[in-house]
Amino acid sequence: MKKILLCMGLSALFAGCGGREKPLAEVVDEALARAERQVLLMAEKYSGREGRLPRTWENGEDVSSDSRWWCSGFFPGTLWYVYENSRDPRVLEYARMYTARVEREKYTTDNHDVGFMLYCSFGNGLRLTGDKSYEEVLLTGARSLATRFKPEVGLIRSWDHNRDKWQYPVIIDNMMNLELLLWAAGYSGDESFRKMAVSHADKTMEYHYRPDFSSWHVVSYDTVSGKPHIRQTHQGFSDDSAWSRGQAWGLYGYTCMFRLTGEERYLQQARRIAVFLLNHPNMPADGVPYWDFDSSEIPDTPRDASAAAIMASALIELSGFAEGAEADEYMAFAEKQIRSLASPEYTAPEGTNGDFILMHSTGAYPFSSEVDVPLTYADYYYLEALTRLKRRLQS
């Protein structure tokens, strides 16, 4: 396992003579151009593998999934972001092709990940093309997701496994699936979708967060009282630790909820989570978190580039809802993360890394699963962050 240094090399931070920092717009443009070349290599490689989607690259071998894996929508979504920036017809063709591979998940009712699967793929496709056929897929998917909402609990159930331990498990990742419900409410006029999303966000805010605004990974609820009976981790270092990607999911989720509802309480929650993250004593100097902020092995423990990418994308958006020094702080931290991720420390040379863009993500460290490898969702949120930053720089 490679050890990621606490500070980025000078080559990652500076360009040219005399240590002059490369202009941010140039960093973004170069990163997007590199990403397009790498993503096209991946798209070409998998084009003949019917129904398969890239998941990771481990021990020198491709690891793929079918559409049922929770990450299936991320590679199609990455293609849509590349297309948004390049308008390359080859990328558009691939984006449509890989998006179609996920369509059957509109009927998924046995997990909460239908939001990840469909909104990252069909949602971006609809936004960029206006393809009306994508609306039916998204609405059907939202109806499927809604079957996992239990009014007595007020939340969307995340998982169905480990029923001997959890009555009604909800993980912080689930905040990311609410955007699909809110889209469905706006599209269909059915306010029940919105009520579910708001209820889920409110109860998560009440029961998932500690006084310092870090979050537990898993909260299981009593199905009769609707109150938590277990708070613990599944992928973090310990039940009381701050698993880095989980903190990023929460930051992103509440920022998104404010954008879509205008409810001030969600903006305040996002700000509080940001304060926790940006001021954490174990946040590395380059802004790319360790896989868990409380790992006992810091600094000799893997980073999670996916957490940095999710954070950066969320902070860029959150900065648009803030003013003055607060907005500047969010943007400065996101810029640091983007510069780090775009550096040779984290961006793979073209044609390597299994054709993924970013290196050094961590999936589930406690299970020795996907440790210090590329991950499809790291690339997706990195492309989203680059796209958001490019828009901001052009505005």
Q: What are these model-derived regions, one by one?
A:
Residues 1-4:
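Positively charged n-region of N-terminal signal peptides that target proteins for export
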Residues 6-9:
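Sec-dependent N-terminal signal peptides
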Residues 15-16:
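C-terminal motif of bacterial Sec signal peptides marking the signal peptidase cleavage site
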Residues 20-395:
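Glycan-recognition and catalytic cores of secretory/periplasmic carbohydrate-active enzymes
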